[in-house]
């Protein structure tokens, strides 16, 4: 009898568990993780490593909801081409496990949750920026550029660069030059992150008529463009050190070391543009690059890191004259 009663509880039913998994998949959690890392880094730098735990967790939860909403709407719009591609045809919407109206309600609920969490847990500016991120991703990238321009990921990449603005605004209530440099870092990093992936699955994009750069302009051109954008990353990342002086020597060292590895891989890709394993290597490293760069920002912004750096500088300044 007891077993029968428990079996009738909806949330213990296997079908309910699968539905929860399907909704979770609509949000594209792997993408969300990268957004949250950049948001966290911005908050850490903006607060000099002293952000409050409540604000930190509230902002990250809201960011996850906003990104999940945008990704769900993207899945709704792209369900037709997802059905055609073998790689994506088993996703919740093209497979029919989730209906469009259900996904729409889910996306709206996530967006509203994100807005109110930020509006009441942080400030209105961060809430509006999160909504702007959704609007840019859906309006500019998904609806306008993805199926019409080879520059879709370049211009549409602005949406992925908004999370650090949200994090910065949540802490400070404003957007300084440093916040916009963080935006620029993500904006410039997006093409050399995404284009190698597009090179890996070029056949899929060609099959459904999506004009990604490798489909329209070829592998060699895409590899060259990847190299150029990777080249631009170093001077932009170092703007946080000079002239803005919001990050120090530890971050600069990490940024340079990571960039050397990144540009080396991007150069290798230009030499073998048809090598999909090389494209995969660049794609994977681009993720590691961003994660470690953000970690470097965070550690560099900690008070004790700054104290160690200033103390070491004073010792060095006192030591150099004694040598002379």
From Swiss-Prot:
Its main location: membrane. It holds the Pfam family UbiA. It is a multi-pass membrane protein. It catalyses: heme b + (2E,6E)-farnesyl diphosphate + H2O = Fe(II)-heme o + diphosphate. Its EC number is 2.5.1.141. Keywords: Cell inner membrane, Cell membrane, Heme biosynthesis, Membrane, Transferase, Transmembrane, Transmembrane helix. The chain crosses the membrane at residues 31-51, 56-76, 105-125, 126-146, 153-173, 181-201, 214-234, 238-258, 285-305. Pathway: Porphyrin-containing compound metabolism; heme O biosynthesis; heme O from protoheme: step 1/1. GO terms for biological process: heme O biosynthetic process. One of its GO terms (molecular function) is protoheme IX farnesyltransferase activity. InterPro entries: Protohaem_IX_farnesylTrfase, UbiA_prenyltransferase, UbiA_prenylTrfase_CS, UbiA_sf. One of its GO terms (cellular component) is plasma membrane. It is found in: Cell inner membrane. HAMAP family: CyoE_CtaB. NCBIfam families: cyoE_ctaB (TIGR01473), PRK04375.1-2 (NF003349). Converts heme B (protoheme IX) to heme O by substitution of the vinyl group on carbon 2 of heme B porphyrin ring with a hydroxyethyl farnesyl side group. Carbon 2 of the heme B porphyrin ring is defined according to the Fischer nomenclature. PANTHER family: 4-HYDROXYBENZOATE SOLANESYLTRANSFERASE, PROTOHEME IX FARNESYLTRANSFERASE, MITOCHONDRIAL. Belongs to the UbiA prenyltransferase family. Protoheme IX farnesyltransferase subfamily. This is Protoheme IX farnesyltransferase. It comes from Acaryochloris marina (strain MBIC 11017). The lineage of its organism: Bacteria, Bacillati, Cyanobacteriota, Cyanophyceae, Acaryochloridales.
